[in-house]
Amino acid sequence: MVPLVWHERPMEQMRDDGRRFLEDLRGRRTTRHFSTRPVPRDLIETAILAGGTAPSGAHLQPWTFVAISNAELKQRLRDAAEAEERRTYEERMPEAWREVLAPLGTDAIKTHLTDAPWVVVLFRQNKRLRGNGEWGPTYYATESCGIAAGMFIAAVHRMGLVTLTHTPSPMGFLQTLLERPGHETAMLVLPVGYPAEDAKVPDLARKALEDVSVFFE
């Protein structure tokens, strides 16, 4: 153990910092319309490192961020994703899921996977290699990776870029295409870049505090 480094802030600064952060995040929107404008690799590295500051079960950090800018590989990824998505939209999608997707205008065409300059695929590590060469389990890997994804998304927004949480279903093809080991499972596909000049977003509202919280005082 080492000492915690922590500096108390005046209450008004805490409130101001919290409000500014909230207002910044309220401006975050998910778009499927990306510019092809390049994004330097170091910005993606910074976002990944920010995601990696997330707490994790037993501090095992059970995530792998695979970042892709290679145009040929992005095209192969898009082709495979669209093939799966077409089957989902045409054959596998439950009516209840189709109902909630309708206002978002989604379909099987995934231009964001080739337009965005970067595609980051987040893999969950289901087990870990011990120092003695034997495999052991990870713990709370799904929850840990979910938190890491949220912090990655916040970092992308804070830098002035946009991203999209894409979950092609099923996602097994990503493990093969990206040559990941058998103990890793794809969780999220996150295109990252600048929004297109004509980018659109759904006209949606976020739930109010009273709809998402309960306080006991």
Give short role names for the model-derived ranges.
Residues 116-118, 159, 186-188:
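Generic beta-strand structural signal
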Residues 1-115, 217:
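N-terminal amphipathic, basic helical "cap/leader" segment at the start of enzyme domains
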Residues 66-68, 120-123:
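Short, conserved beta-strand edge motifs with alternating hydrophobic and charged residues
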Residues 47-51, 120, 126-177:
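Small-aliphatic-rich amphipathic alpha-helix that forms the alpha element of a beta-alpha
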Residues 71, 124-126, 196:
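Short, flexible active-site-adjacent loop segments at beta-strand->alpha-helix junctions, enriched
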Residues 174-187:
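Short, electropositive alpha-helical surface patch
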Residues 2-17, 30-31, 185-217:
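C-terminal helix-cap and adjacent tail motif
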